[in-house]
Structures are given as structure tokens and as C-alpha cells.
Amino acid sequence: MPGTAATAIPEEVEVVASARSDDLLTLSAIAVFAFIITDVLCESGRAAVALLTISPAGRLSSIGWSSAYDNVWVDASGAAIGLIAALVFCILFRSFKTSGWSTRLFLLLCCAFAALSGAGYFVVAGFTDFGDWYTRLQGLHRWTALSVSLVIGGAMVYGLALFALSRGFGQLFTERQRVRRILLISWRAAILVYLCSAVLNPGGRGEIALSSLPIVTISDFGLFFVSLFLPRRASAAGEVAKLDRSFAWIGTSAVCALLFIFVLGRGLMLSR
């Protein structure tokens, strides 16, 4: 029995050490790059819908599309594009099984940010009337059929996204503590860059409050719950190696983050 206890402690220490061995800068870079990609896809897609339908001009920024000519379909397109993007990234993740695990982690984080933000729009907007669905719900009494449908439908999609993401992370990692650390670092790094870009938005506090920023920040917090749904495994034999420092990821992410904050954060005027 003493031998069993003695071997249990080193094994626990080994798991903790492994959970902390991934390079912090590289992991943050992958998360930031994934977040920027999904945000640009959603917001630029929304801008494209607006310009192709009703808006002759508007401002595209990191926290949303702003125009005096938008309608409910333009306001709704952000969430829809996010969910479509999540599905595409999920397919890519499942297809690139032989790629390096840092690449697969990038695709999985892209899927996570897009899915949680997209589904979160429905849930939060059904309760609060702000974000992309703010215009659609303006003037309606609380708990109409539309708002109830948004909350219920969004919650179902959100739960499905958490379940699917847990299966994805379960294919890469077997250590729960390692997954928690990866998700914590990813959320902090992504939201920090997002907030930095929002500070430079020329629309001021009012536009920021009604932008996608509050919903995205709250929705992506769901990353912390992914580890709760990880499949239980008896052995960690399939655990991937630690993430070493990659200046390719760090450099690419740094350039994109600077452009995201100082260019897209200030907004770009677009017209037909």
C-alpha cells in the first residue's frame, strides 16, 4: 500500500507539470489568431450582406458593422454567419487529422469562437435586447414568441456546441487540467485583444454597448465549460506532446493583432 501511494503522487505531479508545459506565448498567439479570423469573417460577412442589399455605405470595425440603412436581415446575419463558419471549421478539423496538433487546435478554437458567439447572440439577445438582434426586438414586449424562440433555440445550439467542442478537445487531449488551462489562456488572450480594439472605436461607449462586444465576451466564456463534458479516459497514452514555442504562430498573430486593433478597431468606411 505505501508503494501505491508513493507512485500516485509522482503521477499527479507529472500530470500537473504536463498541463503547464505548453508555451504560453504560442498558445496565446494561436487563440488570438483564431479569434481574429472568426471575428473578421462574421463582421465582414455582415457588411457584405448590408452592402449587397440595402446599405450604400457604412463603417466596419472589430466590434461590428454600423450603418444608418441596416434592416433586420442585416442585423441577423452576424449570428448566422458565425454558425456557418463554425460548421466549416468543424469539417476542416475533422478532415485535417494528419496535420500538426497546433494546426488542429487553431481550427478547433476557430470553431469554438464562431459557434459560441453565434449561438450566444440568440440567447443573450432574447434576454437583453442588445447586439445584432437589438433592432429586431426593439418595440416588442418581453417574452414574445420571438424572444422565447431565440432563447430556447440559442440555448439548444449553445449546448450542442459545447458537447461537440468537448469531443473535439477530447481527440487532442486526455488531461482535463491541461484542457482547462488551454481554454483559460485562449479566452483571456482573445478577449484582451478584442477589448483593446474596442477602445479605439470612434462610436464611443454607446455604440460599444450595443455592439457585438458584450455578447461575444459573455458567450465565449462558455469555453470554461467545455472541459466539464470531456470524455473520461482511463489512460493518457494518446496525449499529444507539449506545445513548443513557434515564432511563426507568434509573428503571424502579432501582425494580425496590430492590424485588428489599430486599423479595424478604428473602423473602415466601406461603400458600394
Predicted regions and their residues:
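Membrane-interfacial, low-structure loops and terminal tails that flank and connect transmembrane helices
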Residues: 5-18, 168-185, 235-246
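Small-residue-rich helix-interface/hinge motifs
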Residues: 22, 30-86
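Final/C-terminal transmembrane alpha-helix of multipass membrane proteins
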Residues: 32-33, 244-270
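Membrane-helix interface motif
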Residues: 47-57, 115-132, 266-271
